């Protein structure tokens, strides 16, 4: 009808607003798989991880140190674990982990040959920008 128009405002806010209803805009990002090789010095294993992985060694993750440059609301972190390349990723039995702006670290116990990190949110008024995440990783031997 005459006189009716719509105004669309893009790239503002963190929620979807439609017909006065506010809903979350879900977001997620998943890293690629990474694995480790045990460092060898003069032919002897050092039990230290070398991040130039070959998928031969099991790795143990004991801690996640999240780094969000800007975070409002809660964010979910999940470790996706695989022992073989064509295997379906399994989530760590202790996760997923809810991260708040005051979370400094998350203690966990995860073991796998390769691990990917998934970060997501599904709640209203949530936004985040990634920094550099850190994981405490140790070589866990061959299996």
Enumerate the predicted regions with their spans.
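Beta-sheet repeat architectures centered on beta-propellers
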Residues: 1-143
């Amino acid at each position: 009808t005459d006189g009716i128009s719509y105004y669309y405002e893009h790239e503002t806010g963190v929620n979807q607003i439609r017909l006065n209803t506010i809903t979350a805009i879900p977001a997620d990002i998943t890293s690629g798989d990474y694995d480790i090789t045990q460092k060898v010095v003069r032919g002897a294993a050092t039990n230290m991880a070398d991040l130039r992985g070959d998928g031969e060694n099991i790795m143990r993750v004991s801690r996640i140190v999240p780094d969000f440059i800007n975070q409002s609301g809660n964010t979910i972190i999940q470790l996706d674990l695989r022992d073989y390349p064509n295997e379906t990723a399994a989530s760590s039995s202790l996760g997923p982990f809810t991260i708040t702006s005051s979370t400094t670290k998350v203690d966990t116990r995860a073991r796998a040959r390769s691990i990917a990190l998934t970060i997501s949110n599904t709640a209203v008024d949530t936004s985040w920008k990634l920094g550099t995440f850190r994981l405490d990783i140790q070589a866990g031997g061959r299996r």
